[in-house]
Amino acid sequence: MSQELWKSYFNTGLESAKAGMVETSIDYFEWSAKLKPDNQEILYNLGVSYMTIGKMTEAIKAFTNSLKIDDTNSDAYANRAICFSYIDENGKSLSDVKQAVKMGAVEAGLKQAIKLVEEKKLKEKKLSKIKKKNENNN
């Protein structure tokens, strides 16, 4: 029964993610992972979902657990590199970039993705400062 249930949860998680219901997909991927903790595909998709909503620390944990099961997933290294960059773990990010590229990821594309994430982070910091300034003025 749990064999079929984990797959049902996983597939519902995928469909939820495709529909833009990322928080819902996280729930389903977590339920699926509890039933099938040794499945790297579940953990990878959990990482992608966390990354999508900006929960980079949780995403890193999921990608790391996925890579413990299957260390040949260049996408997991690439996504984890992006997450590490976002939380200013640049040494770890660079290490994962090198590993992803060694496994076939396109270096220019990955570096561009990291650059975009860093730009987004800077914009968020600026916006946060503006909001705080406005709150203090009111």
What is each model feature region?
Residues W6, L94-N138:
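Terminal, low-structured helical/coil segments at or just beyond the last alpha-helical repeat
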Residues K18-A19, T52-I53, Y86-I87, L116-K123:
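Register position in tetratricopeptide repeats
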Residues W6-K7, Q40-E41, S74-D75, E107-G109:
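Helix-start (N-cap) detector for alpha-helical repeat units in TPR-like alpha-solenoids
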